């Protein structure tokens, strides 16, 4: 639920807020339509892939007996799509590059970038551990269901920083960057985080994470 909530929160709520506040300050905002088209296409493919195991189980097809193998194959397909998207992104888009040149911001060195990412990753690990420990008592005291906590609370809190950055970029009239940050966040969860967690759950044992979702989550995802 938290993964699906993160995808929906970025794609609907945060993108809507960014467009609202960006338009409120700057009026009509224009952006290059090609990168969003690519992201939307990949999201449609990812959604179709995520729905397959659920349909196989709910419709009681012969594939239901091979959900484990199906999950692994679909996870690999999603990771291949992510790799292809990263390759395209690294090549860069001329319109976005032009916008970056107009802003005139200095670029970070590779060493500084790696150090900052490593520090952010370590900090995120500690914060996540604290957040999980604090969430369970809060759910019990406030009467929050697991579905609501996953779809709303964890999804919004887990992506709070990048969500604020996307809205801030739209406020500064950098629409290309804003849309890229927000939409790519959802895409990375669908194509990267979800399949990696599924594969790790099978490798490490214990609780198994599968692509089989509840009918409600499937309906929400398709909408």
Language-model features: where?
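C-terminal transmembrane helix pair
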Residues: 168, 175-223
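Short helical (or helix-break) motifs at transmembrane helix termini and adjacent helical loops
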Residues: 14-18, 157-167
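Short alpha-helical transmembrane interface motifs in multi-pass membrane proteins
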Residues: 116-121, 147-151, 180
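Alpha-helical transmembrane bundles of multi-pass secondary active transporters
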Residues: 11-133, 142, 207-223
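Membrane-spanning helices that line or support transport/gating and their immediate boundary helices
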Residues: 23, 134-138, 163-167
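Transmembrane helix-bundle signature of multi-pass membrane transporters/permeases
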Residues: 2-12, 35-43, 151-159, 181-189
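Membrane-embedded alpha-helical segments and adjacent helix-loop junctions characteristic
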Residues: 1, 126-148, 155
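Juxtamembrane helix-boundary/capping and inter-helix hinge elements in multi-pass membrane proteins
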Residues: 1, 21-37, 140-148, 169-179, ...
């Amino acid at each position: 639920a938290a993964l699906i909530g993160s995808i929906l929160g970025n794609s609907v709520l945060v993108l809507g807020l960014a467009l609202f506040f960006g338009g409120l300050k700057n009026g009509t905002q224009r952006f290059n339509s090609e990168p969003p088209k690519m992201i939307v296409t990949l999201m449609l493919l990812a959604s179709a892939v995520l729905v397959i195991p659920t349909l196989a189980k709910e419709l009681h097809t012969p594939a239901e007996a091979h959900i484990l193998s199906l999950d692994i194959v679909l996870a690999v397909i999603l990771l291949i799509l992510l790799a292809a998207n990263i390759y395209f992104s690294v090549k860069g888009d001329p319109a976005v590059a032009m916008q970056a040149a107009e802003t005139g911001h200095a670029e970070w060195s590779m060493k500084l970038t790696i150090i900052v990412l490593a520090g952010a990753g370590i900090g995120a690990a500690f914060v996540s551990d604290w957040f999980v420990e604090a969430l369970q008592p809060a759910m019990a005291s406030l009467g929050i269901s697991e579905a609501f906590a996953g779809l709303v609370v964890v999804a919004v809190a887990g992506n709070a920083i990048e969500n604020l950055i996307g809205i801030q970029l739209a406020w500064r009239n950098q629409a290309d960057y804003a849309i890229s940050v927000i939409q790519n966040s959802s895409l990375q969860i669908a194509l990267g985080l979800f399949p990696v967690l599924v594969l790790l759950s099978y490798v490490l044992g214990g609780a198994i994470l599968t692509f089989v979702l509840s009918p409600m989550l499937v309906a929400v995802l398709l909408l």
